[in-house]
Amino acid sequence: MHSIFKKGHPEAPVFVLLHGTTGGDETSLLPIAQELNKQATVLSIRGDVSENGMNRYFKRLAEGHYDLEDLEKRGEALHKFIQQAANEHQFSLDKIIFIGYSNGANIAIQLLLTHPDSYHQAVLYHPMFPVELTNQPDLTDTSVLLSLGEHDPIVPLPESMRVIQLFQNHGATVQEVWTQSHQLTYQEIKETQTWLAHLSS
């Protein structure tokens, strides 16, 4: 997998950046990470699936219909890659905060659900997860900030509500931020800064 690593302050969090689909790559969220915490360690990973020349983290069968077998396979591969990076760069999985946008937020959800003992915190911008769970993970140690669009052209409102319920039903601590559409906004960055400050207090 292609990635960028930047060592930060040992007491600061580790941001694992997972980009969106449209033109996204491992550089896309770096300015946002810098805005959120200049001292954070950063691991930014490019999705290794190409759809019409655009980078994704897993295949889909159609808009809103995921290839579930590929989602599981790519999720496990990403988990192993993060484990290897943690060993190589000597940081703890406990310090990881996923910063995921759109497709990147979706693969982050997969990791939070399948490895709740490894990952506990995430900022998820405009996620959608139309998946029936085969397991019932215990997410009582998980905290997520969900940033959702009231008029998102990609994620219908019922799908945003489904993500909220997914985390709440499995015991996670959930904070919601509501915006208008699918693009990232300055409001979301400010809300994320506040959430991160509360998380570390």
Where are these regions (language model features)?
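C-terminal catalytic histidine-bearing segment of alpha/beta-hydrolase fold enzymes
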Residues: 161-164, 168, 172-201
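Serine-hydrolase catalytic machinery in alpha/beta-hydrolase-like enzymes
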Residues: 1-91
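A conserved short beta-strand
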Residues: 117-129
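Conserved alpha/beta-hydrolase "acid-adjacent" motif
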Residues: 153-159
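Gly/Ala-rich beta-loop-alpha elbow adjacent to hydrolase catalytic centers
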Residues: 99-104, 108
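Alpha/beta-hydrolase fold nucleophile elbow
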Residues: 90-100
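Short beta-strand/loop motif that positions the catalytic acidic residue
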Residues: 145-148, 152
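Conserved alpha/beta-hydrolase "nucleophile elbow" surrounding the catalytic nucleophile
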Residues: 19, 100-101, 149
